Amino acid sequence: NKLGFDQQIAALSRSCSYHLRDLRRIRPTRNFHTANVIATSLVQSKLDYCNSLYLNLPAHCINKLQVIQNNLARAITSKRKFDHISPTLRSLHWLKIRERINYKIISLTYSALQSGKPHYLRDLITLQSTRSTRSGSFITLSRPPASKLKISNRSFYYMAPVLWNSLPAHLRQPAPPSSDNSGQNNTLALSRNKFLSQLKTYLFKFSHPP
């Protein structure tokens, strides 16, 4: 009745812990690559599943999810319980939980802008008129007014423009006008693969500051 995620995160933690115990048990007989594939398939996939719903959860909830990822990194790399984990996460090239959530929201926003699908998300975002921005050289979204309800400010409708407009200009470059009759009217210049690659590079510095 409080629309909290404590019970869901507790259940997720139990499920991941079960797989982590098995991974630690077999880790001495598996090489790093195999252990990494198992970890990604069985545990990291659970952390990423519908993780956009975790957007802007209280820090204590995000920290519980981060503990799972930290333990997963230790299991893969055979680190001890109290070894400093940040260098390990960096070496694995993993975004931390908060940045993984932002990555999901921004990638959904990209898809909605580029393809117009899914329609139920595309209808929630509005391109800002170039005349009302400092520069018309990149794609900016209109930001809705903040609500007094905290749960409303966790919605895609509110947070997608906030996260999108915080991206550097090179990720928001508009596509050049189409000169053919292909019927494709892309909004953004970068292809999906290039956008996601550069987005991860951008978010990585927030997960692992230099």
List PLM regions with ranges.
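Hydrophobic/basic alpha-helical segments
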Residues: N1-P210
